[in-house]
């Protein structure tokens, strides 16, 4: 406990410009460093992730708006088709003597083609939404993976020293020598 209070007291007294050294007191340095690093990560990481998600949300909303506009166009086409249907029905009354079944077939074909068009537009809207969502998810995953990889590389680089590096190389050379003896 005395070391902790001494470290906080010593924060007010900076060493002179000529001295440099390592503080080996773990209790005095790590909580401060960790809190600073975590604070920086949370502060900057939250903003980046929030901006990325906001951008994706705007793109998805724009896609939905475009799909709604297409839907509005389809509804307009449906109204035109209904108008044509009414016209066809009027003509059907006039030409009933000439053949009612042919007009009925045309009416059904017109209705079916209109419903197919609406179905296609709805499917296109749903596919577009799913595609945009998947693309947003993939980009978020990629950014998170890149950040995690950078953090892991930073941790590895900070933990590696020359002695550990030489031991790892020696162990790998030994394993390769053993594998060569086995294959010979």
Curated annotation (Swiss-Prot):
Subcellular compartments: Plastid, Chloroplast thylakoid membrane
GO cellular component terms, semicolon-separated: chloroplast thylakoid membrane; proton-transporting ATP synthase complex
Main subcellular location: plastid
Pfam families: ATP-synt_B (PF00430)
Residue ranges crossing the lipid bilayer per the database entry: 27-49
Keywords, in A-Z order: ATP synthesis, ATP-binding, CF(0), Chloroplast, Hydrogen ion transport, Ion transport, Membrane, Nucleotide-binding, Plastid, Thylakoid, Transmembrane, Transmembrane helix, Transport
Keyword Lipid metabolism among UniProt keywords: no
Bilayer disposition of the protein: Single-pass membrane protein
Domain of life: Eukaryota
Keyword presence, Chloroplast: yes
GO molecular-function terms, A-Z: ATP binding; proton-transporting ATP synthase activity, rotational mechanism
Extra facts: In plastids the F-type ATPase is also known as CF(1)CF(0).
Function noted in UniProt: F(1)F(0) ATP synthase produces ATP from ADP in the presence of a proton or sodium gradient. F-type ATPases consist of two structural domains, F(1) containing the extramembraneous catalytic core and F(0) containing the membrane proton channel, linked together by a central stalk and a peripheral stalk. During catalysis, ATP synthesis in the catalytic domain of F(1) is coupled via a rotary mechanism of the central stalk subunits to proton translocation.
Family according to the record: Belongs to the ATPase B chain family.
The protein's assembly and partners: F-type ATPases have 2 components, F(1) - the catalytic core - and F(0) - the membrane proton channel. F(1) has five subunits: alpha(3), beta(3), gamma(1), delta(1), epsilon(1). F(0) has four main subunits: a(1), b(1), b'(1) and c(10-14). The alpha and beta chains form an alternating ring which encloses part of the gamma chain. F(1) is attached to F(0) by a central stalk formed by the gamma and epsilon chains, while a peripheral stalk is formed by the delta, b and b' chains.
UniProt protein name: ATP synthase subunit b, chloroplastic
